[in-house]
Amino acid sequence: MLFPNGNKNDGGNMSKVKLQTAAEIGTLIRTKRREQHVSQAVLAGLASVGTRFISDLENGKGTIQIQKLLDVLNALGLGLYIFNRWEKD
């Protein structure tokens, strides 16, 4: 799968992906959830959030709560990396 910013989903071996929009975050969450064969309801339970939150997140809603996003990422075995975009990788 190709993300809107040109990143490719590498079948689960991804180490870093640069995401710039809520829609890209949602696409990544949906892709990873499906790769793990987890329903939205199960993921919501694992992350202690509602299924509506998972749906909103996967659909790119831009006003989600950061802690809930972190909880969902953690439930999927993912994390968030912040970097200075003006420095070289």
Cite the ranges covered by each PLM segment.
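N-terminal flexible/basic segments that precede or flank functional cores
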Residues: 1-24, 79, 84-89
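Short, contiguous strand/loop micro-motifs
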Residues: 16-17, 27, 56-57
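Short basic helix-loop element that most often maps to the first helix and adjoining turn
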Residues: 27-42, 46, 71
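Recognition helix of helix-turn-helix/homeodomain-like DNA-binding domains
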Residues: 48-62
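DNA major-groove recognition helix of helix-turn-helix/homeodomain DNA-binding modules
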Residues: 67-83
